[in-house]
Amino acid sequence: MEMTEASKHTTTHEESEHVQNPEPDQVLSQRQLLQLNQKKWWISVLICLFLVLLGDSLVILLLNFFYVQDRREDNNQDLQYKGTWMQALIQNAAFPILIPLFFIFPSPKPNPETINTRFLSIRLILLYFSLGVLVAAHSKLYALGKLYSSYGFFMLISGSQLIFTLIFTAIINRFKFTRWIIISIVLILVSYAFGGPVFSGEPDENEHFYGIQAWLTFAASVAFALSLCLVQLSFEKLLVKTKRYGNKKVFRMVLEMQICVSSVASVVCLVGLFASGEYKELKGDSERFKKGETYYVLSLVGLALSWQVWAVGLIGLVLYVSSVFSNIVHMCASPLMAFIVVLAFDFIDDDFSWPRIGALIGSVLALGSYFYTLHKRNKKKMVEFNQSENNVEV
């Protein structure tokens, strides 16, 4: 009987030692798992970055095509400032294409520690509704800003969105700035100021409105920056910490966020479209289109899809990195858009000049600076894992 108790005590002691000192194969598998997760993370970041650049490029191409065919370059005062509710609606209306993807992407099992489901649902509904109204306001103000001022002036003001993002993320998200992130911010602000594309929907020089209408772009920048920071907060404090999707950051979160927010924003823009009476002009817009009604519809559909591509990539970068990085990538697309517009359209006196070349180089350096910060962060995680492994061995 005594031998049996002694053997049990020995077995228990060996099991505890085994837990405290994992086998080499187990440590190796943990290291491989960390490396695999980091590789998956990098792939996700690069895919989202590509979606943002692709969406931005397609949007500026199709917007220029739309306003050229809509005879906006004729500077007809009666036509110049119409269609802003429609453009705002187009930015959000294509969200149904994401619904099949939402069900295709796997969803991890929720953690048993998830807080009260009913309370969580109420918080989510309030969050999505608030963000939807904010996005609708940004979409409307963004559409107005492009038409009420020169595009260069519009780009200069909209560059303040990064400044507002820095302010909001420092307050809301407690974001920590590193030396390389600050360098990236400075580079992208300079590049954004000199690398903007031409926009065919802007008014003639004698029609610039540098009054309250043009400065509405500031309000659009504030709404855009605030929405990004609130999205990051919702990922960190609601969808991740409540264990609704387990303990992981998964792409399904991005799709859920975009579908719900865009649906609310679309309803708001649709109400604005009918309340303003702008819907009555839709038939005239299609008939006035140079290429005909078919191309009119196709251009709007293309714009709607392009906006969704851009938004999914943007929110994905917020999830995997931060709202600051997401905004920097969006602004890095400006010199690239200028290059694409020069190739696709034959605007008078528009070329890819030396300032734009410098802006393109600056954008690449800005991305490189931020990527270096991300590389150092992942490397630090690996070093900390190795240190913990050495402590276990000792």
Curated annotation (Swiss-Prot):
Pfam families the record matches: PUNUT (PF16913)
Q: Which InterPro entries match?
A: PUP_plant
Give the sites modified to Phosphoserine. S29
First-listed, main subcellular location of the protein, grouped into a coarse class: membrane
List the residue ranges of the region (Disordered): 1-24
Q: Where in the cell is it found?
A: Membrane
**UniProt superkingdom:** Eukaryota
Q: Can you tell me where the transmembrane regions are?
A: 43-63, 85-105, 124-144, 152-172, 180-200, 211-231, 254-274, 301-321, 328-348, 352-372
Q: Tell me one GO molecular function of this protein.
A: purine nucleoside transmembrane transporter activity
Q: Which UniProt keywords apply?
A: Membrane, Phosphoprotein, Transmembrane, Transmembrane helix, Transport
Q: PANTHER family, from UniProt?
A: OS09G0467300 PROTEIN-RELATED, PURINE PERMEASE 17-RELATED
Q: Can you tell me which family this protein belongs to?
A: Belongs to the purine permeases (TC 2.A.7.14) family.
UniProt protein name: Probable purine permease 23
Per the record, the gene is PUP23
